[in-house]
Amino acid sequence: MAKFECTDEVTNFLTELPKCEHHLHLEGTLEPELLFQLVERNGVQLPGTFPKTVNELHVIYNNFADLQDFLNYYYIGCNVLLSEDDFFELAWSYFKRVSTQGLRHAEVFYDPQSHTSRGISLEVVTKGFERACAKAQEEFNISTKLIMCLLRHCPVEECMDTVKSAKSLIESGVIDGLGLDSSERPFPPELFVECYQLAKSYNKELQLTAHAGEEGDPSFVTNTLDLLETTRIDHGVRSIEDAELIKRLAAQKVMLTLCPLSNVKLQVVKDVSELPLQEFLDNDVPFSINSDDPAYFGGYILQNYLEVYSRFGWSKAVWAKIARQSIEGSWCDPKRKQELLSEVSEVVNKYVNLP
C-alpha cells in the first residue's frame, strides 16, 4: 500500500528526471485500442474466446494469474501485427507516449519468432521498429538500441535459426543486443549457450542480456552470467535470496532491469513495497526501473517511478543515484552518457526545495 504522497512537486521532479528504459518489450506496448484497430485493418481472425471490446480486454489485463496467463494473451496480440507499418506504428505509439515522461534513452526488446512463425520476415519486423527508433531520435532526441530476444519456450534449433537469419543485422549493428525471454523455469539458460556464442561471433560488440530470477531461483541468474556471459540481468529480483550473488552483482556492476508493476501484475510479489529495492541500494547492486509490457501491466515508465516513490519515499539524492546508475549501465556511447548525466544534475539542482 502507498505510504508516501506523490505531491505535485514530487511528480514534476520524477517526470523531468532523465530516464533510461532497459526492459521494454515493444510487443508489450500493444494497447487494446490499437489491437482492435489492427484487427479491423488487417482482417485478422482472433480466437472465439478472445474479448470482443476494449473494456473487456482491459478487465483481462487487470487480472493475470501469472506469467503464463499473461503470455497467452501477449502471443495472441502479436497476431494482429502484419506489415512493416504495423510494427512502426506500434513502436512509434510507445515513443510518443514516453516522450512526455522524461525518457531520454531506450534499449527495447522485440521477439522476431512471434512473427516469423506466422510467415513475416525478420527484416520486415526489424525495419518497422528501426524506423520508429530513428524517428524517436529525430523528433524527441531519445537515443535507442534494439535488442533481439529469443523465445525460450521455442525449440533451441529454431532459436539458432533465428540467430543465423539475423547475421547481417547483427554484423551491421542494426541489432545492438541479444536477449532471452518467455517462460523462465522450464527453459534454463544452459539450453541457449550455443545461440549466444554464435550471435557474439557475428559481432564482438553485440551486447548480451537475458531474463533471469523473475520466477526462477537465484541459480538462474548465476548460470545466465556464467554460461551466457551476459553483462546485464533482466528482472533478477530473486537474486536477493543469495548473499554471494548479491556481492557479485555489486562487485561486477551487473545492472538489474527491474519492473515493479510487472512483478505485482504477474504475482511475483503482492505489492511494490515487497520488492527488495532498498536492499539492492544498500548493497550497491545497480538497477534501473522499467515498465516491461506496459499495455498489459497498467503503467509506463513514469507510473513505475511514481509507484516506487509512493512505497519507499526516497529522497532526491536517491533518485539521482538511480538515474545515474541507469545511465552508466546503458549501452550508449560515453558522449551520450555525459549528456544525460548533465541533464540529471540540472533537474536535481532545479528542485532545491525537495528533500
From Swiss-Prot:
Annotated compartments: Cytoplasm; Nucleus
Chain's role: Catalyzes the hydrolytic deamination of adenine to hypoxanthine. Plays an important role in the purine salvage pathway and in nitrogen catabolism.
Protein known as: Adenine deaminase
Top-level taxonomic group: Eukaryota
Organism encoding this protein: Kluyveromyces lactis (strain ATCC 8585 / CBS 2359 / DSM 70799 / NBRC 1267 / NRRL Y-1140 / WM37)
Cofactor(s) demanded: Zn(2+)
Keyword rRNA-binding attached: no
GO cellular component, one term: cytosol
Gene3D superfamilies from the UniProt entry: Metal-dependent hydrolases
Pfam families linked to this entry: A_deaminase (PF00962)
